[in-house]
Amino acid sequence: MSQLVQFIDGQWLAGAGKPFESKDPAKNQVIWQGEAASAAQVEAAVKAARHAFYHWSDLALDYRLAIVRRYADLLGEHKEALALTIARETGKPLWETRTEVAAMQGKIAISIRAHDERTGTVENPMPGAKAFVRHKPHGVVAVFGPYNFPGHLPNGHIVPALIAGNTVVFKPSELTPMVAEAMLKIWQEAGLPKGVLNLVQGEVDTGKALAGNPDIDGLFFTGSSRTGHFLHQQFAGQPGKILALEMGGNNPLIVKDVSDIDGAVHAIVQSAFITSGQRCTCSRRLFVERSVQGDALVKRLVEVVGQIKVGLYDAAEQPFMGAMISEKAALGMVEAQANLQRLGGESLLTLTHLEAGTGFVSPGIIDVTAVSALPDEEYFGPLLQLIRYDDFDAAIDQGNATSFGLSAGLLGDSEADWQHFFKRIRAGIVNWNKPITGASSAAPFGGIGASGNHRASAYYAADYCAYPVASVEDSKAAMPDQLSPGLTF
């Protein structure tokens, strides 16, 4: 394994900080080792980005776009190798990591279109002059990436930031350093000038050094609510720096009067258990009516979820669920389930840690209807809380009884119920009769409350990657036709 794991000012360097490693959570094997970037190396990365900023932002947009498009082409050339790297480091099945790489490619054209539509140049009519609205890059921005989509989600910040003319210092999750290294090598192959994109690998100390660097102009973060809140506090009193936070959710999914039970169950499974429940949009709470139909749906759901195939990412017969990101994460889900049981929850399908040393768990469903003080927690794994209800409005109110507000959904045949639900539910992603995990890069992605800070990403990422500049212009200074009162020339 190479120890040259930091990419600073166009050079691969060994880290000068503490050693750390990455494990394949499905096979319990160390697959990456390196030393973290020291505070001095983080400072060097920021300085390199600052030095490269004017050169990069002064380049014609078409030149920047040519490099970004070349990156998209190279993603296609390296798609299978990159998909395998993501699978090895996250435990996700290959069928899913292949879709992640495809989403990374698709993000390029979407980001170019969003940049043009949302942050392009507009000329407004004005007598005696020209009026323009243009957009400028912020400068040096830090990007913090998560582990669940270690390619696609940081890509969703990095690509629009570079298109806009920013330079970037990227701090990936310490759980997925191998994916980050592979991404940077593809960018390097695409011909990105030195200093434009820098990689600082490491754990908490590296992240703190980057977030606290006084010379960054902004920080774009996707990850846990806990870390996002820490960053928000760290940036307090710095209104000149832009902070874009995309965090988690305690997402409600309500079922009411469905005619196709299997169709509803499929949407629930896709909402709660895809990616082993490790999507920020995954449903954490399922509301089902107390009725004969509701009983039938719950029974069918338990049957289907109990048959979900869990297995190795590279198995010939692909599983629906792979391993969670780590054994620690898997054991955390076991403990979360135990805590809900202590509070009065009844497991309908018990989540079980399947193999010591790995992130493999079976999916779980727990009825928490009887729990009077349900914790407002994002259980980031395949554990679905079931709540039975009698009144639709009360279910919506309970769905809104969370500090989060990322995603929500209704499964039901009545359009009137859908319209009512849409008006009342508080979330940034609200779906009807579709899984709540299928967000599109061609739409804004973000939430309210503890799920974000009103800086929606995906298609709206262009908005936080550049700031608007209004200009009134004429070719020369000239006397007006009429002077203001009190002036003599």
Swiss-Prot record:
A GO molecular function term, named singly, is: succinylglutamate-semialdehyde dehydrogenase activity
Positions annotated to bind NAD(+): G223, S224, S225, R226, T227, G228
Q: Which Pfam families match?
A: Aldedh (PF00171)
Pathway(s) served: Amino-acid degradation; L-arginine degradation via AST pathway; L-glutamate and succinate from L-arginine: step 4/5
Reported EC number(s) for this entry are 1.2.1.71
Q: Which UniProt keywords apply?
A: Arginine metabolism, NAD, Oxidoreductase
Family matches, as Gene3D superfamilies? Aldehyde Dehydrogenase, Chain A, domain 1, Aldehyde Dehydrogenase, Chain A, domain 2
- InterPro entries for this protein: Ald_DH/histidinol_DH (IPR016161), Ald_DH_C (IPR016163), Ald_DH_CS_CYS (IPR016160), Ald_DH_CS_GLU (IPR029510), Ald_DH_N (IPR016162), Aldehyde_DH_dom (IPR015590), SuccinylGlu_semiald_DH_AstD (IPR017649)
Please indicate if the UniProt record lists Transport as a keyword: no
- The highest taxon in the source lineage is Bacteria
A GO biological process held by the record: arginine catabolic process to succinate
- Name the top EC class: oxidoreductase
UniProt cross-references to PROSITE patterns, sorted A to Z: ALDEHYDE_DEHYDR_CYS, ALDEHYDE_DEHYDR_GLU
Enzymatic reactions: N-succinyl-L-glutamate 5-semialdehyde + NAD(+) + H2O = N-succinyl-L-glutamate + NADH + 2 H(+)
Residues in the active site? E246, C280
Function according to Swiss-Prot or TrEMBL? Catalyzes the NAD-dependent reduction of succinylglutamate semialdehyde into succinylglutamate.
Family designation: Belongs to the aldehyde dehydrogenase family. AstD subfamily.
Tell me the NCBIfam families matching this sequence: arg_catab_astD, PRK09457.1
The protein depicted here goes by the name: N-succinylglutamate 5-semialdehyde dehydrogenase
Species in which this protein is naturally found: Aeromonas hydrophila subsp. hydrophila (strain ATCC 7966 / DSM 30187 / BCRC 13018 / CCUG 14551 / JCM 1027 / KCTC 2358 / NCIMB 9240 / NCTC 8049)
